[in-house]
């Protein structure tokens, strides 16, 4: 995951065999939405020269459902279409897929268990055209999944080994009968349920961020971060998928490569 289109970073990945997801900044959304020539210029400068190493573009990050980014929500759908059409103009729309990244805030707070996952009612008008776009282009729904955040918000109800994916805890979804052994799987399947409830069961899902902090909270320790990251690496490598979508690999990025201790 490359936040913003830093050409020096993208150049460094050229020839490495590693493909990356490039984000546009949220602040750029109004310009991308208002004029396709802006999107075309951005693609020609920041994407086309490095196309061999870019797999996806995320137009914005956590724009919907987060109060501090709500000023950009009205521009999101148009920006996505203009970026896609700019890729079409240089014949890169089949090799580079366009989507946008969502936080758990787009889900209704009552989305438990996973089979009852659904989007907040105020989000649906904004997310429906995005789902239509993803369905028609074959692009994935992108989500940031953080069991740590859910755990510290409800530690009295969530066991730490379940949040870390490192124990023998089993939680049954009373509605579907599926058994969950990790909060990560439960959160991913909650998003999938929400997508399916709107009629888009054909859309795949990518986890664009997940991780566990190592400082700043009693449960944010090096040992816990190591345990969680080891679990994620094993889970992704196994391609076992989730209870709702077994044997379906989950493309996942660990956040972050470096310590953001000043964030």
Residue ranges and their predicted role:
Residues 1-5:
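Catalytic beta/alpha-barrel core
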Residues 7-14, 43-49, 88-89, 128-136, ...:
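Short amphipathic alpha-helices and their capping/turn segments at secondary-structure boundaries
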Residues 10-108, 112-122, 207:
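Substrate-binding cleft of extracellular glycoside hydrolase catalytic domains
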Residues 81-85, 94, 99, 121-263:
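Substrate-binding and catalytic surfaces of secreted/luminal carbohydrate-active proteins
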């Amino acid at each position: 995951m490359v936040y913003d289109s830093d050409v020096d970073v993208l150049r460094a990945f050229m020839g490495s065999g590693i493909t990356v997801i490039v984000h546009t900044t949220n602040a750029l959304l109004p310009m991308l939405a208002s004029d396709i020539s802006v999107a075309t210029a951005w693609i020609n400068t920041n994407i086309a020269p490095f196309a061999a190493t870019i797999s996806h573009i995320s137009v914005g990050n956590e724009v919907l459902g987060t109060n501090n980014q709500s000023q950009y929500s009205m521009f999101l759908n148009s920006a996505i279409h203009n970026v896609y059409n700019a890729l079409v103009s240089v014949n890169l729309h089949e090799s580079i897929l366009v989507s946008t990244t969502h936080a758990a805030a787009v889900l209704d707070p009552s989305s438990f268990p996973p089979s009852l996952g659904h989007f907040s009612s105020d989000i649906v008008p904004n997310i429906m055209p995005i789902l239509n776009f993803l369905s028609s282009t074959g692009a994935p729904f992108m989500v940031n999944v953080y069991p740590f955040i859910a755990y510290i918000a409800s530690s009295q109800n969530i066991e730490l080994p379940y949040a870390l994916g490192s124990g023998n805890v089993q939680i049954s979804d009373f509605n579907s009968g599926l058994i969950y052994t990790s909060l990560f799987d439960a959160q991913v399947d909650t998003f999938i349920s929400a997508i399916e409830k709107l009629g888009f069961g054909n859309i795949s899902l990518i986890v664009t961020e997940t991780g566990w902090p190592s400082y700043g909270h009693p449960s944010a320790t090096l040992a816990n971060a190591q345990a969680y990251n080891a679990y994620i690496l094993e889970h992704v490598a196994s391609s076992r998928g989730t209870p709702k979508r077994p044997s379906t690999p989950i493309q996942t990025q660990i956040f972050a490569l470096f310590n953001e201790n000043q964030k």
